[in-house]
């Protein structure tokens, strides 16, 4: 699994475009999607120790992506 900074950099390179595109589709704003993508990878990095491998890594990352985007959309509602 992810055991070093190099491994995490590889993970980011592998998923950054897919995560950004998913965030952009959900948020509809380029700058918001870029900010969300950074936030998502910070959360992924912090939560990797909790990843149990019960789901595919990509599914886990996309779930974090959806949760971050939903949270951002809710915070913008009046």
Feature-to-residue mapping (PLM):
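A short, charge-rich alpha-helical start-of-domain segment used by transcription regulators
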Residues: 2-21, 34-37, 45
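Residue-level detection of beta-strand scaffold positions
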Residues: 8-9, 26-27, 65
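Generic leucine side-chain signal with a strong bias for well-ordered alpha-helical environments
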Residues: 11, 27, 42, 48, ...
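Structural recognition of an alpha-helix C-terminal capping motif at a helix-to-coil junction
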Residues: 21, 35-42, 55-67
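Short alpha-helical functional segments enriched in proximate histidine and acidic residues
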Residues: 22, 26, 47, 68, ...
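Arg/Lys-rich amphipathic alpha helix in sigma70-family domain 2
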Residues: 50-52, 66-78
């Amino acid at each position: 699994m992810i055991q070093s900074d190099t491994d995490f950099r590889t993970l980011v390179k592998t998923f950054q475009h897919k995560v950004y595109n998913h965030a952009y589709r959900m948020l509809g704003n380029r700058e918001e999607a870029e900010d969300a993508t950074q936030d998502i990878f910070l959360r992924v990095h912090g939560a990797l120790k909790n990843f149990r491998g019960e789901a595919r890594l990509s599914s886990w990352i996309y779930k974090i992506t959806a949760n971050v985007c939903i949270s951002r959309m809710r915070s913008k509602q009046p």
